[in-house]
């Protein structure tokens, strides 16, 4: 059985600027004199984990319950700012349609919170029927986040599919490494805030890449 994995949420939709704005609004409401500009936010999001991002920025001066309150505020504003503000990235709908036509399984392999994924699903509901996805993962599904391969090994086992018949689309080098370490063919589909310091081969023509992969492997 063949499988297409969309990785981090940035493979489906550009939300980095909306999330940065949501973080800054949350900081202000919580009473913190913090402001994440585009430059430092780009560096922060090269690895996943919003709660960890807050902890590291505070230099562990905030208590866990305070970090959670800030993150909950961020989620609230992310939901608010996402309404009618996002659409799928170019090529995504073609890939999903190709999977449906050819009976290829679909996975959305994230290590983020269910609250965040629910916002993405709601925001893209005009374009994407997430019932077409055979598996959607969250942070609870692995003990170690990307670039550790745990979440992809979990997905492969859960769907009972072969790695050599699977392909992953990821948006940052860190998340790309997670899929590669699981020995899955991986395409780097950089987002607007993605930093590719190691010059990993990347592509914005993901439909062509996916189609070529399965044609070579004779679906």
Residue ranges and their predicted role:
Residues 1, 103, 163-165:
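A general structural motif
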Residues 16-17, 48, 93, 111-114, ...:
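Alpha-helix N-cap/helix-start capping motif
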Residues 113-114, 119-219:
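Asp-based, Mg2+/Mn2+-dependent phosphohydrolase catalytic module
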Residues 12, 106-109, 168-169:
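Conserved SAM-binding loop
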Residues 1-2, 101, 214-219:
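Short, Lys/Arg-enriched, disordered terminal segments
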Residues 2-93, 98-102:
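N-terminal helical cap/lid subdomain that shapes the substrate entry/recognition surface
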Residues 23, 92-123, 179:
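Substrate-recognition element of Asp-dependent hydrolases with the DxDx(T/V) motif
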